[in-house]
């Protein structure tokens, strides 16, 4: 788009404009970097073969791309906050189901959920998790753009990338500490 003048907005201004989008973007950075940096490590730790690990990462990436369309479609018709919360909630549920289905420590804590250790279900849950979690990045960008002037879209996008990056720096450290 052509703008007469590009505006400026700093991170503090982004937070004032939308605390939800900025905090959510930071958390999105954490989860995306943890997923893409340690997803393979986790799969290897539960004895997946090299092919299964490759397939898992392929499915994560495909789900993240494919789910952009339906999530984006609904976010254009329903309040974006609702979609952000819905995607986050669904991602959390699928994440828990993936952990339980992998047969790791959560299942050994006598959860009331009786889901067998099944690689296929693990693949399904992780794919659905990625499908819900990855589009949150674009939802946050769209949400912040709903509340700023067009001249600030580029600056807001850059600021949101920085916020995402700060979360992405922390993600692998937080996740690896929790995996131990």
Describe the role of every protein-language-model region.
Residues 2-25:
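Juxtamembrane intracellular "pre-TM" segments in multi-pass secondary transporters
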Residues 19-25, 30-42, 46, 52-53:
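Helix-loop boundary and gating motifs at the non-cytosolic
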Residues 43, 74-75, 176-180:
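Interfacial helix-cap and linker-helix signal at transmembrane-aqueous boundaries
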Residues 50, 148-160:
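Loop-to-transmembrane helix entry/capping segments in MFS-fold secondary transporters
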Residues 55-64, 160, 164:
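Transmembrane alpha-helical segments of major facilitator superfamily
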Residues 61-69, 168-169:
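Residue-level signature of mid-helix packing/kink "hotspots" within the transmembrane helices
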Residues 82-97:
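Structural signature of the two symmetry-related core transmembrane helices
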Residues 134-148:
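Intracellular juxtamembrane helix-capping segments at the cytosolic ends
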């Amino acid at each position: 788009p052509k703008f007469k003048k590009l505006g400026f907005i700093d991170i503090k201004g982004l937070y004032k404009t939308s605390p939800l989008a900025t905090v959510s973007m930071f958390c999105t950075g954490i989860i995306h970097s943890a997923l893409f940096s340690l997803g393979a490590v986790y799969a290897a730790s539960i004895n997946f073969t090299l092919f299964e690990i490759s397939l898992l990462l392929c499915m994560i990436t495909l789900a993240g791309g494919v789910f952009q369309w339906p999530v984006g479609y609904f976010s254009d018709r329903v309040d974006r906050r609702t979609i952000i919360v819905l995607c986050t909630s669904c991602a959390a549920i699928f994440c828990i189901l993936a952990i339980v289905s992998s047969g790791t420590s959560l299942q050994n804590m006598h959860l009331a959920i009786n889901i067998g250790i099944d690689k296929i279900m693990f693949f399904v849950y992780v794919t659905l998790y990625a499908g819900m979690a990855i589009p949150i990045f674009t939802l946050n960008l769209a949400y912040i753009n709903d509340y700023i002037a067009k001249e600030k879209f580029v600056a807001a996008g850059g600021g949101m990338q920085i916020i995402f990056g700060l979360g992405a720096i922390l993600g692998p450290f937080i996740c690896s500490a929790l995996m131990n």
